[in-house]
Amino acid sequence: MSYQDLKECKIITAFITPFHEDGSINFDAIPALIEHLLAHHTDGILLAGTTAESPTLTHDEELELFAAVQKVVNGRVPLIAGVGTNDTRDSIEFVKEVAEFGGFAAGLAIVPYYNKPSQEGMYQHFKAIADASDLPIIIYNIPGRVVVELTPETMLRLADYPNIIGVKECTSLANMAYLIEHKPEEFLIYTGEDGDAFHAMNLGADGVISVASHTNGDEMHEMFTAIAESDMKKAAAIQRKFIPKVNALFSYPSPAPVKAVLNYMGFEAGPTRLPLIPAPEEDAKRIIKVVVDGDYEATKATVTGVLRPDY
C-alpha cells in the first residue's frame, strides 16, 4: 500500500487495545470491534498509537496486536502502525521489524517526548527513521503530550524527504493552514483532534486520525460528506452537536472515556492499563449520556468550551 491508498482515507480510527480485567490483551474482542468500525465509515486504522495505550505495550504485544487485526481486516482498509518512541535507535529497530512484518501502509512516529530535542535533533530523528526501511512514515506532532513542538518550517523540511508522506498535526489550525498551503503535493495532512476536524477539512486537510470514530463515525462521515458537497450549513449543524460528544470523550484521560462508551455499547474494550485508570462510575455515566444519547446537559457541570486532547 502507498500514499495513494491513504489519500482516500478521510476517517482513520486510532484503535483502542482491548484488555481483560487482568491487563492482558483481549484478542477475542478485536473482531467485533473491527467490524463495528468498518460498518460505521472507518477508512483506515492506526494500531499501537496513543489511544492504544502504546506506552504500556511491549513490542512483542504490538506485533501480536498487528497480526490479530490484520487477520480480521484482511486488506479491506489500510493500516498504520505506531513505530516511534523518544529513542531513535529503538525506533529504527522497530520500524525495520514492522517493515519486515508487512501489511502496513505507513508507520506513525511521534515527536520525541521527555528528552526535549531541538528542531535539528527532531529533523535528524525522523530522517533516521525514514532511512531505516521502505515503510512510509507519518509524523505525529502533539506538543501537549511531548512538550516540544515540531515547527511548520521543520515539518516542511521533512515533507520533502522521500519516505516521509504525512503528518498527524495537533498544534493549531494556523499551523495546519500554513502546512496545507506550502506542502509538497503528495504529502498527507491529518488533524489528530476530533474537535478540529470540521475546520481542518475546510482548510484542505486530508482527514482525521480519530478517537471519536469508535463511537460516532456516522456523524463524522455525514459531516465530511456535507463539506465535500459544499453544504456548510449542514456540516456546521453537525459540528455543533458533535463538539459536546468530543468534549465528553476527552473529559478524562483518554482512552478511558471511549472505553467506557464501548463497554456500554457491548464491545469488550475492558479497562485501561496503569498508570491510566478507568473513568469513575458517575463520570462514565455522564460521558455515555452525552456520546450515546446526545444528552448535552449531562456534561455542562464539568466541561465547557472545546477540550483539546493534550492528555
UniProtKB/Swiss-Prot annotation:
The active site is at 140 (proton donor/acceptor), 168 (schiff-base intermediate with substrate). Pyruvate binds at residues 51, 209. Keywords: Amino-acid biosynthesis, Cytoplasm, Diaminopimelate biosynthesis, Lyase, Lysine biosynthesis, Schiff base. InterPro entries: Aldolase_TIM, DapA, DapA-like, Schiff_base-form_aldolases_AS. Its EC number is 4.3.3.7. Its main location: cytoplasm. The keyword tRNA-binding does not apply. One of its GO terms (biological process) is diaminopimelate biosynthetic process. GO terms for molecular function: 4-hydroxy-tetrahydrodipicolinate synthase activity. PANTHER family: 4-HYDROXY-2-OXOGLUTARATE ALDOLASE, MITOCHONDRIAL, DIHYDRODIPICOLINATE SYNTHASE. It is an enzyme of class 4 (lyase). Belongs to the DapA family. Catalyzes the condensation of (S)-aspartate-beta-semialdehyde [(S)-ASA] and pyruvate to 4-hydroxy-tetrahydrodipicolinate (HTPA). The keyword Repressor does not apply. It comes from Streptococcus pneumoniae (strain Taiwan19F-14). The record marks 50, 114 as: Part of a proton relay during catalysis. This is 4-hydroxy-tetrahydrodipicolinate synthase. It is found in: Cytoplasm. One of its GO terms (cellular component) is cytosol. It catalyses: L-aspartate 4-semialdehyde + pyruvate = (2S,4S)-4-hydroxy-2,3,4,5-tetrahydrodipicolinate + H2O + H(+). Pathway: Amino-acid biosynthesis; L-lysine biosynthesis via DAP pathway; (S)-tetrahydrodipicolinate from L-aspartate: step 3/4. CDD domains: DHDPS. Homotetramer; dimer of dimers.
